[in-house]
Amino acid sequence: MRTFSNIIGGGVLLLTSMFACNDPMEVDNAELEVWADEVVVPAGKSVVFNISGNAKLISFYSGEWGNDYRYKDAGRQLPIESLELNFGSLLSNAKQKSERYVLLSTDFNGNYKDIGAIQKATWQDVTSHFTLAGSNNETESGTLNLDDFVIPGKPLYIAFRYLCFPIASESGAPSWRINRLLLNAKTKEGDMKVADISTTAYTAGFNIVDFGKGTNMESISIVSASLVRLQGKDGPTEQGNEVWAISKGIDTGVLPLLPDVAVPVKGVADADIKQY
């Protein structure tokens, strides 16, 4: 791949001559000339770029937010001014006894396989700041500002803790589902998503820690692309269990953004263009 760029008035036209094969081959040099009749224009006014050459791919970076050539390989690092957390939850089989908590830690060591490490960590109970579901109807938690719970330079772990108890009913233990979560940052550029329940770059990275794992009380808790479900064993049980869902360590000081993306101007299969 060969890449060249032309910079005009703060914008960047990027051309790429691409080829790939198993054996070496001769290729023509890509050529590109770009010029504009005006290189200094007021904001909001259209600019026409004149283009000549044989570039196979042409992309454009205007220099605007999200379209800046300087951040094409690595995104911006935005200082976080404030953090807020909210989520939605449901509780099925709610007639059976359970206890549910929302906890935060800044000193958990991130070892999800070590129950002792979880018990040793300091967990701040913030349950009372939220509204938890009491039925199978989705319940909005409300929003909590986390500024009083973070420590500069230390990662933040978010945890949902679930306790179930011996049950005589065939219906089994309650199922607590967190089916939406948003950790939001306030920055100088406005509100920005930090983490959610997903498989995208924003994933909060929840891990299930089942205190009954490997025993006859092992839970059926899961983390999927769209929810966290904490649920004890099905059917009658003679013992209870404790299950946690703990997020990855989240940076509370700086928000790393994804790289900026160019606007496509010309593709390999497209005819040559004269203006953009």
Q: Across the structure, where does each feature detected by a protein language model lie?
A:
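Extracellular beta-strand-rich recognition modules
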Residues: 83-91, 100, 104, 153-164
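Non-cytosolic beta-sandwich-type ligand-binding/adhesion modules
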Residues: 91, 95-135, 142
